[in-house]
């Protein structure tokens, strides 16, 4: 009997040999004829057939009969015979240990293997991280719900109170580490994402409410260092400026104290009028010397200030010289003749000063020195105004001249005489060969007019011999 459609002959005897004893292996050598194309050869093969349980073989036998029944009666009879042969040669043992004892020694099972086919009970599970997952058992596929879908969805007041407590304790640095976040997540039964989000929102809320007591964490250390360096440099710069201000104040105080001391020394003296601060060069002492502090000249007319502004820029007066200025101005303010007052203003704008030795030119500072008592009125041009600055060593002489001028300035001025003087000032580039100098002289005593006029006429030749160049007044404000 053969099934040519299957490609191999079917013998009446079974090709499967299963030993009756389950302890031995079921590997037997049999002969099998296989037709390959036109030739057929008999080959010997070894088949190993394991033992099966009754419930497995019963189902396979019925399925085999149903499958072979479609081929008609001849095949159905063969299928029935084959099913009977299978049933005869397979042992049906209720003991499952007989199945595993037939395996090779390398697959031996320990004692108690019979419990494998008993009902499977759920073993106790071990959770290494989160104990809250221990109450959830494995599902039918053996997986665990690690997504936290069964955990708390939103934070309650109890959980947020724990987080708020930690935030208050660490308000100087409200950035919890990874371990602290894990600890807080376990305590509050929240996820790490929820804890991190809560702290981020809390920091943003505190920053918006201007309750920030920590330095931003995202700011690099170099930026912090640069900020500190800039603050230190700014403090040092302010310190240097304050030191400079202190030094200037000290210098001004020293200078003012020297001026006051020299003025106090010269007050009680009643020495005769000196001709010059420098004994080598004769200088006229006919014009009174009085300091004109610009700060104390508030009530003066603006044209007088313009005359002062037309003069070259000179040294600023010391702040403490106002006490002497008030003494000088009190005489002018108490004067009842506005004409004399106007003469004094004009004389202050165009005062003629003496020369220094060999090119050293001397011009009074803001003290506005006027040598002697005579008050000239400048006519067309100014002749004899020289450039230069007063030496600090001449402060005492200046104060003495000022005191001498105070003694005669309050006297009533007698009638003046008008004279025209020829002053040869060829050294000044803007002038002609001779300059007209009209002066109105007011003098307290008679008999000095001619001598003082001659002294004034000798001034221009002296200037020309000394080769000193008069400078042009420049407006500086």
From Swiss-Prot:
<keyword id="KW-0238">DNA-binding</keyword>
<dbReference type="GO" id="GO:0006357">
    <property type="term" value="P:regulation of transcription by RNA polymerase II"/>
</dbReference>
<feature type="compositionally biased region" description="Low complexity">
    <location>
        <begin position="310"/>
        <end position="321"/>
    </location>
</feature>
<dbReference type="GO" id="GO:0000978">
    <property type="term" value="F:RNA polymerase II cis-regulatory region sequence-specific DNA binding"/>
</dbReference>
<dbReference type="GO" id="GO:0030182">
    <property type="term" value="P:neuron differentiation"/>
</dbReference>
<feature type="compositionally biased region" description="Basic and acidic residues">
    <location>
        <begin position="254"/>
        <end position="264"/>
    </location>
</feature>
<dbReference type="GO" id="GO:0000981">
    <property type="term" value="F:DNA-binding transcription factor activity, RNA polymerase II-specific"/>
</dbReference>
<dbReference type="InterPro" id="IPR008422">
    <property type="entry name" value="KN_HD"/>
</dbReference>
<dbReference type="Pfam" id="PF05920">
    <property type="entry name" value="Homeobox_KN"/>
</dbReference>
<feature type="compositionally biased region" description="Basic and acidic residues">
    <location>
        <begin position="219"/>
        <end position="237"/>
    </location>
</feature>
<dbReference type="InterPro" id="IPR009057">
    <property type="entry name" value="Homeodomain-like_sf"/>
</dbReference>
<feature type="compositionally biased region" description="Acidic residues">
    <location>
        <begin position="243"/>
        <end position="253"/>
    </location>
</feature>
<feature type="region of interest" description="Disordered">
    <location>
        <begin position="209"/>
        <end position="282"/>
    </location>
</feature>
<dbReference type="InterPro" id="IPR001356">
    <property type="entry name" value="HD"/>
</dbReference>
<feature type="region of interest" description="Disordered">
    <location>
        <begin position="303"/>
        <end position="323"/>
    </location>
</feature>
<comment type="similarity">
    <text>Belongs to the TALE/IRO homeobox family.</text>
</comment>
<comment type="function">
    <text>Transcription factor. Binds to the iroquois binding site (IBS) motif of target genes to regulate gene expression; functions as a transcriptional activator or repressor. In concert with irx5a, plays a role in visual performance.</text>
</comment>
<keyword id="KW-0371">Homeobox</keyword>
<dbReference type="GO" id="GO:0005634">
    <property type="term" value="C:nucleus"/>
</dbReference>
<dbReference type="GO" id="GO:0048468">
    <property type="term" value="P:cell development"/>
</dbReference>
<dbReference type="InterPro" id="IPR017970">
    <property type="entry name" value="Homeobox_CS"/>
</dbReference>
<feature type="DNA-binding region" description="Homeobox">
    <location>
        <begin position="148"/>
        <end position="210"/>
    </location>
</feature>
<protein>
    <recommendedName>
        <fullName>Iroquois homeobox protein 6a</fullName>
    </recommendedName>
</protein>
<keyword id="KW-0539">Nucleus</keyword>
């Amino acid at each position: 009997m053969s099934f040519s459609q299957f490609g191999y002959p079917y013998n009446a005897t079974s090709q499967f040999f299963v030993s009756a004893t389950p302890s031995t292996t079921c590997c037997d050598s049999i002969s099998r004829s296989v037709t390959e194309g036109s030739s057929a050869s008999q080959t010997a093969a070894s088949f190993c057939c394991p033992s099966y349980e009754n419930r497995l073989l019963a189902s396979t036998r019925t399925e085999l009969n149903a499958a072979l029944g479609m081929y008609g009666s001849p095949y159905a009879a063969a299928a029935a015979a084959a099913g009977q042969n299978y049933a005869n040669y397979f042992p049906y043992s209720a003991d499952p240990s007989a199945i595993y004892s037939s395996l090779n020694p390398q697959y031996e099972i320990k004692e108690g293997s019979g419990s494998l086919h008993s009902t499977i009970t759920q073993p106790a599970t071990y959770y290494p991280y989160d104990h809250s997952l221990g109450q959830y058992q494995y599902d039918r596929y053996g997986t665990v719900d690690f997504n936290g879908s069964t955990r708390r969805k939103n934070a309650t007041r109890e959980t947020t109170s724990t987080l708020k407590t930690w935030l208050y304790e660490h308000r100087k640095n409200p950035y919890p580490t990874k371990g602290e976040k894990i600890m807080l997540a376990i305590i509050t039964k929240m996820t790490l994402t929820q804890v991190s989000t809560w702290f981020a929102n809390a920091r943003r809320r505190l920053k918006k409410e201007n309750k920030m007591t920590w330095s931003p964490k995202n700011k690099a250390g170099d930026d912090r260092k640069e900020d500190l360096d800039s603050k230190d440099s700014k403090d040092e710069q302010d310190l240097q400026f304050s030191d400079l201000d202190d030094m200037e104040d000290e210098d001004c105080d020293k200078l003012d104290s020297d001026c006051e001391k020299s003025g106090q020394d010269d007050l009680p003296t009643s020495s005769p009028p000196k001709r010059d601060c420098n004994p080598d060069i004769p200088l006229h002492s006919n014009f009174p010397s009085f300091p004109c502090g610009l700060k104390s000249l508030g009530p003066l007319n603006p044209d007088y200030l313009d005359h002062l502004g037309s003069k070259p820029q000179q040294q600023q007066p010391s702040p403490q010289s106002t006490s002497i200025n008030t003494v000088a101005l009190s005489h002018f303010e108490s004067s009842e003749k506005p004409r004399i007052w106007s003469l004094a203003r004009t004389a202050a704008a165009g005062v003629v000063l003496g020369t220094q030795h060999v090119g050293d030119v001397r011009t009074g500072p803001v003290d506005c020195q006027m040598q002697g008592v005579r008050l000239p009125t400048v006519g067309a041009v100014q002749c004899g105004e020289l450039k230069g600055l007063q030496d600090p060593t001449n402060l005492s002489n200046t104060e003495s001249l000022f005191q001498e001028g105070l003694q005669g300035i309050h006297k009533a001025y007698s009638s003046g005489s008008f004279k025209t003087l020829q002053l040869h000032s060829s050294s000044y580039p803007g002038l002609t060969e001779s300059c007209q100098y009209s002066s109105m002289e007011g003098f307290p005593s008679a008999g000095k007019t001619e001598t003082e006029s001659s002294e004034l006429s000798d001034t221009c030749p002296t200037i020309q011999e000394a080769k000193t160049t008069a400078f042009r007044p420049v407006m500086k404000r």
